[in-house]
């Protein structure tokens, strides 16, 4: 049996083209590519603005079933499908998110795909890349510093220090920083107060960068951030302490999309990186809309399962950016479906048709949920060597009962050649005119009813549990003019419920709301459910333990 190469070995052996050549394929002149080395570049804001009058290509969303430790390969399928479409002669750009350092050194892994369906340079993308996350972290923490400084020098805006809503962020998993006391050590250090850190991908600044149309829209949204409240409970905005201009300066370059390439030298935008369990889980609007102006097809992903990423892609990103997806692909694996059917991880390599059929309920619900938005669906079965013909056929037969089609894909092992069939079917579906996209709920629906709609229609919950404080807060925001905003649910990615251990397709459960936060700059209301954390912790054995530099100075153990 031939040796199976690791992702990093495959990526390191890639024959990359100079990034200027990748840009030339899209008609981007060299003077509008801002290079970071030879294999990555930012696309200038001037070039992007000049493409506004171009027509749009077809937009394809890649989503998945609920993630399991067995792995689904959503990013791998996104990249593979992009290569597959280019292989059959369709000019295609892949749009994915940047990786966060926290999960890279924690448990989740990287964001560059896998096997022979990756974007490169993989090591750079998974580590510091072009510095976007540093810029976002800096802009966020500048605002935090300015808030404390404003209070220290007299508090002209009369901010109630008990009601400051802005925490600090860092791009790392660190549970020790979730709740802290700041400004200790005496009068010279300010007013002691309780605060804390979130991970950078949960920052409202990250969401703003990913939803802003251009730099002016970015600055306006930054100014709209609510940093806290006065004693009369009126909001204080970032613009009130004159923070928005300096924050925009820090984000000027980060606002421009990053161009890289796949292993097969096809263009990919990697830009922005909000998580889908604690944020809206989509790459930047600027990257997606620019790609639509430059290509016939754009393949993008939304984080975690369709209950989180796809719902937010449709209800937040598409609603705010005026996007209309033409088709969706739900990624599933035999192994993950069996795990949703009750099989333990160590037994996933054994054929188990009974558990597979039981676990298909999870896949079926995701397919039906996507269809609720009026978007036609295909299922991609991401192939593993342990899959049996009977198991693959059982999934195909089940998906057929849903009125959709499942296609076996071998892109991890074979690259674009292994996903040609799906590429052809995506083209046919996207061009058939079946998409009748519509968000799940209207803008004018009351905020709590929007939450109930998501919980009941997408999660199949029977009720939403919220105390009087939460309901009153939602009504206050409606009175202040924020009732039109969409909802961003913060929920475990492992289940349709708020219990991460409840696999399959549970129904009739309750969704408890722990907290609500107004992201006025980003333009949505965050609803925190269950035990979800906006600052993750590291696992008992973090991935960092395997990462090192070898004798030749190359990185080992990254993936």
From Swiss-Prot:
It is an enzyme of class 6 (ligase). ATP binds at residues 68-75. GO terms for biological process: tetrahydrofolate interconversion. Its EC number is 6.3.4.3. Gene3D superfamilies: Domain 2, N(10)-formyltetrahydrofolate synthetase, Formyltetrahydrofolate synthetase, domain 3, P-loop containing nucleotide triphosphate hydrolases. Coiled coil: none annotated. InterPro entries: Formate_THF_ligase, Formate_THF_ligase_CS, P-loop_NTPase. Keywords: ATP-binding, Ligase, Nucleotide-binding, One-carbon metabolism. One of its GO terms (molecular function) is formate-tetrahydrofolate ligase activity. Pathway: One-carbon metabolism; tetrahydrofolate interconversion. It catalyses: (6S)-5,6,7,8-tetrahydrofolate + formate + ATP = (6R)-10-formyltetrahydrofolate + ADP + phosphate. Belongs to the formate--tetrahydrofolate ligase family. This is Formate--tetrahydrofolate ligase. It comes from Sinorhizobium fredii (strain NBRC 101917 / NGR234).
């Amino acid at each position: 049996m031939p040796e199976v190469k690791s992702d990093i070995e495959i990526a390191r052996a890639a024959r990359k083209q100079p990034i200027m050549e990748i840009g030339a394929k899209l008609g981007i002149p060299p003077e509008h590519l801002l290079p970071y080395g030879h294999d990555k570049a930012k696309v200038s804001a001037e070039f992007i603005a000049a493409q506004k009058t171009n027509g749009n290509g077809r937009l394809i969303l890649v989503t998945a079933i609920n993630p399991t430790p067995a792995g689904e390969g959503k990013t791998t399928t996104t990249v593979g499908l992009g290569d597959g479409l280019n292989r059959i002669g369709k000019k295609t750009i892949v749009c994915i998110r940047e990786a966060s350092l926290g999960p890279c050194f924690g448990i989740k892994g990287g964001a560059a795909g896998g096997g022979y369906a990756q974007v490169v340079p993989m090591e750079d993308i998974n580590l510091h890349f072009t510095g976007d996350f540093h810029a976002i972290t800096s802009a966020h923490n500048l605002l935090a510093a300015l808030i404390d400084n404003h209070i220290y020098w007299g508090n002209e805006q009369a901010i109630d220090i008990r009601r400051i809503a802005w925490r600090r962020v860092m791009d790392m998993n660190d549970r020790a920083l979730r709740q802290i006391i700041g400004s200790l050590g005496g009068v010279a250090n300010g007013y002691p107060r309780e605060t804390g850190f979130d991970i950078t991908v949960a920052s409202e600044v990250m969401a703003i960068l990913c939803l802003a149309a251009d730099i002016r829209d970015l600055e306006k949204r930054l100014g709209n951030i609510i940093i806290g409240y006065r004693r009369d409970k009126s909001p204080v905005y970032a613009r009130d302490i004159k923070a928005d201009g300096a924050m925009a300066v820090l984000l000027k370059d980060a606002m421009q999309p990053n161009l890289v390439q796949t292993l097969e030298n096809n263009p990919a935008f990697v830009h922005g990186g909000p998580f889908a369990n604690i944020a809206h889980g989509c790459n930047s609007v600027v990257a997606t809309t620019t790609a639509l102006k430059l290509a016939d097809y754009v393949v993008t992903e939304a984080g975690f399962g369709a209950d989180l990423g796809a719902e937010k892609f449709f209800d937040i990103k598409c609603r705010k950016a005026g996007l209309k997806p033409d088709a969706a692909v739900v990624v599933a694996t035999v192994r993950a479906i069996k795990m949703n059917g009750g099989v333990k991880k160590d037994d996933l390599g054994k054929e188990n048709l009974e558990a597979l059929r039981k676990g298909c309920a999870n896949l079926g619900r995701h397919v039906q949920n996507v269809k609720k938005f009026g978007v036609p669906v295909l299922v991609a079965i991401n192939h593993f060597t342990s899959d049996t013909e009977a198991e693959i056929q059982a999934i195909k037969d089940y998906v057929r009962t849903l009125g959709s089609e499942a296609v076996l894909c071998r892109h991890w092992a074979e690259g674009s050649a292994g996903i040609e069939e799906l590429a052809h079917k995506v083209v046919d579906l996207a061009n058939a005119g079946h998409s009748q996209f519509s968000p799940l709920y209207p803008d004018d629906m009351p905020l709590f009813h929007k939450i109930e709609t998501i919980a009941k229609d997408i999660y199949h919950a029977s009720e939403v549990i919220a105390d009087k404080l939460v309901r009153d807060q939602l009504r206050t925001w409606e009175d202040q003019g924020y009732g039109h905003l969409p909802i961003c649910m913060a929920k475990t990615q492992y289940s349709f419920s708020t219990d991460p251990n409840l696999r399959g397709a549970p129904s009739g459960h309750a969704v408890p709301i722990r907290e609500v936060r107004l992201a006025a700059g980003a333009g949505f209301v965050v609803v925190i459910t269950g035990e979800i954390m906006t600052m993750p912790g590291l696992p008992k054995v973090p991935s960092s333990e395997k990462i090192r530099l070898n004798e030749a100075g190359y990185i080992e153990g990254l993936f």
